[in-house]
């Protein structure tokens, strides 16, 4: 369930194994194509997309990140990570949600092994000893499967699954997302700036624009979103500083609350939860989407290594979750640590942050850890 990028990539991974899949999507057919939200793709995600033949379809729509500049407002200390330093073609890549979805669907349209049903509203899910049964409000219902994959972002169907429990914790933060144009061109550099109003991330998105993600306390970001464009651009410059010059223009703001979600319990057979349906995290480290792709890859790999009759069994489901447990916990801990350290404006902590950024810039093992975490989730 779910025909977003994670669900689409999972189906293409199965098609590579000559396995059939049926994607069920609540939205209309072309809804995702106009979605301009920026996705930060890790190098590991690029390798998955290359393997599926998607990268060639996307290459002209993707902006590589060659270096990442991290600093703190009104404080010493900064860190610079460079792809060249680690013999990587890029530290990451930026693409719009809509462009990625279009490329994935273009590839799926060439496959007879993947079917997509749009505007499919699920009314009930029943788990039997040997299968999962899904009921919809359409004539194509019910549907039976040995393995039901929930990859709908956790928005629509989690309440329908018995024994599926998720723990949700609010960060009491809101994210503001838009595109901005600055005096100095991006030149494939991404910036992370820690400020008293929360972290500001600028991701190069094309030759002339940055995608901006500004996260902070709910009350601060909600007030910011109500300001006029010229006032907002001045505020952004005030907090970000002069590194890209003044900000000249921006698009319409999108805001959304930030929450951490983790699985506490799940059905023991015939249902697996992946992507944002399984876990959501703060965007400060850019790990959420890429963790979902690693979920999809790990599950498809396990299916490829398993006997057909074993897929969906209790031992199969248990093996999958155990294979993802360690990395997911480490990624959530890593992300939460960044939030706690860099979203707190206490004076003592601010000094510690400045020292940490200086230390990081001169201590290769920590930089190696960061690059591996960003690139491969390790």
Feature locations, PLM:
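N-terminal glycine-rich dinucleotide-binding loop that anchors FAD/FMN and/or NAD(P) in oxidoreductases
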Residues: 37-60
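FAD/FMN-dependent oxidoreductases across multiple families
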Residues: 220-315
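Glycine-rich FAD pyrophosphate-binding loop
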Residues: 12-37
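Conserved N-terminal helical subregion
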Residues: 47-51, 62-161, 169-174
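Glycine-rich Rossmann-fold phosphate-binding loop(s) that bind the pyrophosphate
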Residues: 2-5
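C-terminal helical "tail/cap" subdomain of flavin- and related membrane-associated enzymes
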Residues: 301-378
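Pyridoxal 5′-phosphate
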Residues: 127, 186, 292
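Conserved FAD-binding catalytic core of PHBH/FMO-like flavoproteins
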Residues: 49, 140-142, 147-245, 253
